[in-house]
Regions:
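Acidic, His- and aromatic-enriched active-site or binding-groove loops in soluble protein domains
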Residues: 21-35, 86, 129-144
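Histidine/acidic-residue-rich catalytic or RNA/ligand-binding cores of hydrolases
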Residues: 12-18, 71-76, 118-128, 195
Length: 198
């Protein structure tokens, strides 16, 4: 069973944002980045994720990350400590994954992050990016762009996958092949079958 979460992000007005505003970067945005540079936030996320794993008997945990964090980190950094929030955030992310792997040795951590945005050497030691790019999610899927992105990528991350939302287009479908492949049967280019609204 796979659990798909985006634990580093919160919405304004949610229980977490109201109860712990000090755990959020003070950037007025639709999405708020959690202060993973703080140990108490890492501990909170660890306990929350563990509760889901234990309750739902999770075997694969997908951690997504669909936001641009740089401005949040820069807003929080002190003038003479530029970059420290980012460094601490990433170090605590690694520690979070290490703690999860120590507690659940057979847990698969799928590092989604908009597909392939966290494929540094340290992340690859702890997690696998099964979903290699969110470019597949675009209505105007460009098979050539996907092939260009994948040139050389499969040597570094051979077990990754994609989806093709244009069934019947052999070239687009084959451009999306990988060890993991998802077919989207409901979203096509046919005018008699519009894209789903959700």
């Amino acid at each position: 069973f796979l659990l798909w979460m985006e634990p580093e992000r919160a919405y304004p007005g949610t229980d977490l944002a109201v109860a712990h505003p000090e755990w959020l970067h003070p950037l007025d945005d639709f999405y708020l980045l959690l202060r993973l540079d703080k140990d108490e936030v890492r501990e909170y996320l660890f306990n929350m994720i563990c509760s889901f794993i234990d309750t739902l008997d999770i075997k694969c945990f997908r951690q997504d990350f669909n936001m641009e964090p740089l401005q949040s980190w820069r807003t929080t950094d002190e003038l003479d400590r530029a970059g420290i929030c980012e460094i601490k955030h990433i170090m605590n992310l690694y520690r979070l994954w290490d703690d999860l792997r120590a507690k659940y040795p057979d847990l698969i951590i799928d590092n989604c992050a908009s597909g392939g945005r966290r494929i540094d050497a340290e992340s690859l030691q702890r997690a696998i990016p099964i979903w290699r790019t969110d470019a597949f999610c675009e209505a105007n899927l460009d098979p050539d762009a996907i092939q260009a992105q994948m040139f050389g990528y499969n040597r570094l991350v051979p077990c990754s996958g994609g989806v093709c939302k244009r069934m019947g287009d052999t070239y687009a479908t084959r451009s999306s092949y990988a060890p993991c492949y998802v077919g989207s049967w409901w979203w096509t280019d046919r005018p008699d079958r519009p894209a789903p609204t959700e």
